[in-house]
Structure formats: C-alpha cells, structure tokens
Design a protein with these regions (language model features):
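Secretory targeting and sorting signals
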Residues: 1-16
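Structural recognition of the beta-strand scaffold that forms the well-ordered cores
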Residues: 25-28, 61-65, 88-93, 131-136, ...
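N-terminal carbohydrate-binding/catalytic regions of secreted carbohydrate-active enzymes
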Residues: 20-125, 277-309
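Acidic/glycine-enriched edge-of-secondary-structure segments
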Residues: 57-66, 148, 169-182
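A general structural signal for short secondary-structure junctions and capping/turn motifs
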Residues: 17-18, 81, 262-265
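Substrate-binding cleft of extracellular glycoside hydrolase catalytic domains
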Residues: 67-70, 77-172, 186-191, 198
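Surface-exposed substrate-engagement region within the catalytic domains
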Residues: 23, 29-55, 180-299
Length: 315
C-alpha cells in the first residue's frame, strides 16, 4: 500500500505504527533442513531436490527453546549471520513453563525464575541488533489448562519477556493463536494482560493451516480491540486454507502457503511469514516423528501440493 493510504487505514484512535519489516530483506539460513535435504537428494532424486530448494529459498523463523544448550550463543549466531547477509532474522521464543499443556511439544523452563533468566540470555544474544521475535506460540490461547495461580504467572512472565526483548532492540509480536481458537474480545483481554501495549503487535496461525483471509479478518478485528496493534500471519503451510478442526498436528492434504512478504493487502498486517519450518514435525501424529524433528516426506508433500496449485503466489 502507498504510505499515505496505509496511514489512513489505521484503526481510528490508534497511533500510526512503523512496520519493522518495511524495506528489509528477511534472513535465509543456507544450512536449513530443506537445504541439507536438497543436497542429499541432488544426485539420486533431482526433481525432489528441486522441490526442497523451493522451501530452502524462503526465509523461515529460527525457534529457540529448552533444547538450546546456550540460548545466548545460538541467538547471537543467528542474528550475526543475518547481519552479515544484511538481512532481518525472525526468531521464536518457545520456552514458557508448562509449554503446550503437556502435549506433543511439552517442556519449557522449569519455573518462572528459570524463564526470566532464559529470556534475558535470549535478549543478550540480540544485543540491540535488528531482529523480530515471535513470543511463545499458543502460550496465551492455551493457558486455560493451567490452574489460576500459574495462569497469573504466565501473564507476568510474558509481560517481562516483551519488556526485556524490546529493551534489547527487537521487534516483538506476542502470539495470539489462530482465528478459530478464541473470540476476539477474549483474546484481546489476554493480550492486554500479556503486555501488548509494549509490543509491536501479535502473531497468528503459527504452525497452523487456516486461510490467509480468515486470519487477516480476525487480525483486523483483534487489532481494533488492542489499540490498533499490527500483526503477522504464518503462511508456511496454509496454501490450501482447508484447516480441519482438531487436525492441527501434521495435518494431511496441506500445501506451502504464500511466500514471505510485506505485500499483505492490509495496513494492519505487517507481514506474511514462514514461522513454522515446513517439514518440521508437529509430533507423533499422522505418521510423524517427534515434535521438532525433520520429516522430509511431509515437506515434500507440502512442496508438491504448492507446485500443483500455485499456492505460494499472491492470490
């Protein structure tokens, strides 16, 4: 959108907000799982290697959690590599205590104090260099599984994370689940308790499959309830836009979605991103390996489907 039109379309009463992605190229990891798979298949399966290169060519977020032995060093490595490319990295903080309600991606920091230390190490790795951080996918919409005491703690921890990451110079988006999870007034209340006023905005559809327009409509509704805050949408696997209720884990019959872009068609949507790594398993469901492990067959299925229907292109 032209800058003037973008300003005119901002929610009434909201302060026009800078898009941290504007004019920036996003970081592409040359050693991503898809890039390594393409190299492994280059001679034996050249057509499939080419499909892996389609995935590898796209900028994708780097996730940090309790598997990172030294989160400061790992974040520093990603942010430094991006700086050498002249690019903007997108990182995901995924280490909240009682993560994923004990399901496929269970884990996280042992307690609140451990999380505070971890998020400070994460922020130290950024060290006031350009970076975007998605804060705790599903952490807000799923907190009903916790007793009230731990719900209150989670809000405190998320507010602290937002404040700490902003102080390190990052652009911060607090995760707000997906359009079919929580109604906008409910989600807005959760975001306010989690410090959305300090953040750049919120993220939608992380690791999910809901259509772009469904997310944009929901995001615009939610934005109006949180002071006009902007949002980003994960389009990594929503090319078919046919999310089925309770089929969020390695859902079959999906496709790669829109390639990352700031050309979203909405003044409130800062970017479409690939937050989820296509081919990274959601868990031991629908034939997949453990959560977070690379699953080449699923990545190939997503790429083949996108090739057939053109779902990575604007539409």
């Amino acid at each position: 959108l032209p800058p003037l039109l973008a300003l005119l379309l901002v929610a009434p009463g909201a302060t026009p907000q800078r898009n941290p992605f504007a004019g920036r190229r996003l970081y592409v990891d040359p050693a991503s799982p898809a890039a390594r798979q393409a190299a492994a298949w280059n001679r034996s399966r050249p057509a499939d290697a080419a499909r892996m290169r389609v995935i590898a060519a796209q900028p994708q977020a780097k996730w940090m959690g309790d598997w990172a032995r030294d989160v400061r060093r790992e974040v520093d490595g990603v942010v430094g590599a991006a700086a050498r490319q002249g690019a903007l990295p997108v990182l995901v903080a995924y280490n909240i205590p009682h993560r994923d309600c004990g399901l496929y991606s269970a884990g996280g920091a042992r307690d609140g104090d451990g999380y505070r230390r971890w998020i400070r190490d994460f922020a130290a790795g950024i060290n006031r260099r350009p970076a975007v951080v998605i804060v705790e996918p599903d952490g807000l919409p799923s907190l009903d599984c916790l007793p009230l005491r731990l719900q209150d703690e989670r809000y405190v921890l998320l507010r602290d994370a937002v404040q700490t990451l902003k102080a390190a110079g990052a652009a911060v988006y607090v995760d707000a689940g997906n359009a079919n999870w929580r109604r906008p007034p409910d989600m807005a209340g959760r975001l306010r308790k989690a410090g959305i006023e300090m953040a750049d905005g919120f993220s939608l559809n992380v690791s999910n499959f809901h259509a772009v327009q469904v997310n944009v409509t929901y995001g615009e509704q939610l934005s109006r309830l949180v002071g006009g805050k902007h949002f980003v949408v994960d389009t990594s696997r929503n090319g078919r836009g046919n999310a089925v209720e309770r089929q969020w884990c390695n859902a079959p019959n999906q496709a790669l979605g829109r390639a990352p872009t700031t050309q979203t068609g909405s003044a409130l949507a800062d970017a479409f991103l690939w937050v989820k790594t296509p081919g990274q398993s959601d868990g031991t469901c629908n034939g997949g390996p453990r959560a977070g492990e690379w699953w080449a067959d699923y990545a190939l299925e997503l790429s083949k489907a996108a090739e057939a229907i053109g779902s990575m292109l604007p539409h």
